[in-house]
């Protein structure tokens, strides 16, 4: 069984949105005044690219909300999640912006702030309140603020509740300003990204890729911008990417887990060999500790294949694999003292 440990937050949604908005017409602007991208400008160019994708979707000076969970029939990138719904906005800090994070009670909601150098100038926030961002505090003229809010993807009523929560996110700013970025040369940017991804493929630990300027390693941060722009520290979200040994689609697996040391929540999402959710008649794609069925002892048993009448059942196919997402993991997970149990062939 292969297991990879990574940390992540907004890379997937960033890639998703860029894929949705990209087109030959906007992919490369006019050749006049192209600004070449080198190793020392790559992070800024990459941030500007993603910021522009959010702006193009209507998220400039205000928040653009993803109103539904990941659609099974329209997955634009691999290994998307159906645990949370996203809200995001890009702001010109020529004038300060104040953002109100609503009180969501026991429901998980995070607010992440990323500047143009892909640093997190303030910690990921989970508490309700008002937060004022200035250019002095953030460090760059533009900033991206992203929310992710827990949602039960199989419950239309819960999705409506999340939509109402999204509408409670408020923005106050004297002037929205303008969005003005260099005309980065996409060809040199693509070449630089490809080269950095070759180096990034040798990384076994992403813990120094994302965070504040003081927390990251400069080289790891550069590589992180290439393979997963917008990732946040492992202390906020840690993923385990697992491929079972006998993932032939015929051998059922199971795992039992109890008392997972997270302050947020955990989930398991199952993908096919291409990394996508594979449509099934059970509408079963992921399990989490909020909506999953507990055993009498408080543990959860996840069934991969086998009897579809079992609780917490996920259908499997040839080449299947899964990701465990751990939101706000406690120190014993980060230290490796507690490990999420792996799925084993069912007895």
Q: What label would you give each PLM region?
A:
Residues 1-4:
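Positively charged n-region of N-terminal signal peptides that target proteins for export
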Residues 27-347:
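A compositional/structural signature for long, glycine/proline-rich flexible linkers
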């Amino acid at each position: 069984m292969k297991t990879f440990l990574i940390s992540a937050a907004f890379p997937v949604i960033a890639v998703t949105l860029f894929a949705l908005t990209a087109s030959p017409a906007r992919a490369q602007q006019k050749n006049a005044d192209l600004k070449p991208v080198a190793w020392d400008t790559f992070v800024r160019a990459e941030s500007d690219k993603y910021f522009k994708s959010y702006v193009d979707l209507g998220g400039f000076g205000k928040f653009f909300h993803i109103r539904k969970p990941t659609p099974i029939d329209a997955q634009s990138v691999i290994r998307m999640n159906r645990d949370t719904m996203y809200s995001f906005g890009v702001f010109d800090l020529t004038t300060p912006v104040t953002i109100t994070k609503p009180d969501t009670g026991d429901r998980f909601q995070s607010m992440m702030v990323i500047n143009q150098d892909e640093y997190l100038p303030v910690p990921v926030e989970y508490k309700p309140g008002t937060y004022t961002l200035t250019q002095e505090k953030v460090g760059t003229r533009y900033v991206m603020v992203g929310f992710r809010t827990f949602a039960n993807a199989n419950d239309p009523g819960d999705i409506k509740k999340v939509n109402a929560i999204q509408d409670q996110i408020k923005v106050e700013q004297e002037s929205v300003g303008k969005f003005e970025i260099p005309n980065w040369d996409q060809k040199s940017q693509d070449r630089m990204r490809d080269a950095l991804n070759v180096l990034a493929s040798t990384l076994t630990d992403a813990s120094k890729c994302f965070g504040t300027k003081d927390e990251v390693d400069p080289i790891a941060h550069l590589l992180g911008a290439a393979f997963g722009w917008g990732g946040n520290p492992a202390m906020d979200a840690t993923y385990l990417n697992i491929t079972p040994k006998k993932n032939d689609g015929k051998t059922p697996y199971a795992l039992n887990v109890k008392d997972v040391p997270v302050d947020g929540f955990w989930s398991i999402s199952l993908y096919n060999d291409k990394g996508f959710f594979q449509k099934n008649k059970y509408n079963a794609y992921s399990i989490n500790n909020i909506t999953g069925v507990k055993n009498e002892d408080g543990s959860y048993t996840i069934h991969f294949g086998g009897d579809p009448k079992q609780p917490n059942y996920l259908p499997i196919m040839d080449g299947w694999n899964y990701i465990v997402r751990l939101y706000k993991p406690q120190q014993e997970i980060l230290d490796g003292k507690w490990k999420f149990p792996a799925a084993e062939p069912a007895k």
